[in-house]
Amino acid sequence: MATPNNLTPTNCSWWPISALESDAAKPVETPDAPEASSPAHWPKESLVLYHWTQSFSSQKRLQVRLVIAEKGLACEERDVSLPQSEHKEPWFMRLNLGEEVPVIIHRDNIISDYDQIIDYVERTFTGEHVVALMPEAGSPQHARVLQYRELLDALPMDAYTHGCILHPELTTDSMIPKYATAEIRRHLANATTDLMKLDHEEEPQLSEPYLSKQKKLMAKILEHDDVSYLKKILGELAMVLDQIEAELEKRKLENEGQTCELWLCGCAFTLADVLLGATLHRLKFLGLSKKYWEDGSRPNLQSFFERVQRRFAFRKVLGDIHTTLLSAVIPNAFRLVKRKPPSFFGASFLMGSLGGMGYFAYWYLKKKYI
């Protein structure tokens, strides 16, 4: 069952417009910038999207939903609950042996890779009434979209997320609850001891590959806890945002005197804008926006973010995420880890709940402690 679209964001004063169902009935009218087309144009071409509606660990999952919404496609969303291990059920493994979400089905096609899903949707759904997110091949705009897709996809979003959770002193007005850092650090403090104990104890419910995965997971979180490493990658992020700021300035100079709305690669809204909007949204959530654009240092980036937030697809998809994350996922995560699971499971689970690493620990917690 898909998450309903009639939820209003809570505790998100910076989110400009709610995603109410009544509002979703009509796109925002922006001059010279057509919004997502109506799903009614594709009655027999609808997609089926299998995903976990409460998963915030991957930027690419968000991008898939935004692309579908921007193109205005009819899409039936079906929930695959990772906590209940539905991705390991035979019915889902028949769709994807890799046990990964999201997966889309269209006609007789089953696609599971993030980038392949985006490319398939863009390539397949075209026409007069459908927004094209990729410019014509061979055009300067097409080359720009490919360039910024590669650049934005390479950003280490999980490292930003873990680092900002563990070092809130580097953030301003983060949406992460203040109690999260202390609780996660409490679990991390005992994580190494717990892992050593499990190495010498028989745990029939834990296979060696699973335990190995947990060790790698903890090593990654501990690496992201290194302040010097975090400052290094945030410095590299600043250089990327400088490049994007300069690109947006070029668009202004190229189109001076024209009335079209300017985006990253030209007058048309493209896939590059979807990716940039999703990236800025995550950075805002983590408490990095005041440092990187709201301080006036990158006015073009700030203008871009304000405009992209007003788009119907972004209000619809991201409004639901705020509501679910703040009202359901985070509180439930902290209730679960209070039942005294091993510290390394508690730390990794809380990290996943706050948007970083995924839910490797949930199945074990649920089976052993609930």
From Swiss-Prot:
Residues 177-344 form the GST C-terminal domain. It holds the Pfam family GST_N_2. The keyword ATP-binding does not apply. The keyword DNA repair does not apply. Keywords: Coiled coil. Residues 45-129 form the GST N-terminal domain. Transmembrane segments: none annotated. Belongs to the GST superfamily. PANTHER family: GANGLIOSIDE-INDUCED DIFFERENTIATION-ASSOCIATED PROTEIN 1-LIKE 1, GDAP1, ISOFORM A. This is Ganglioside-induced differentiation-associated protein 1-like 1. It comes from Mus musculus (Mouse). The lineage of its organism: Eukaryota, Metazoa, Chordata, Craniata, Vertebrata.
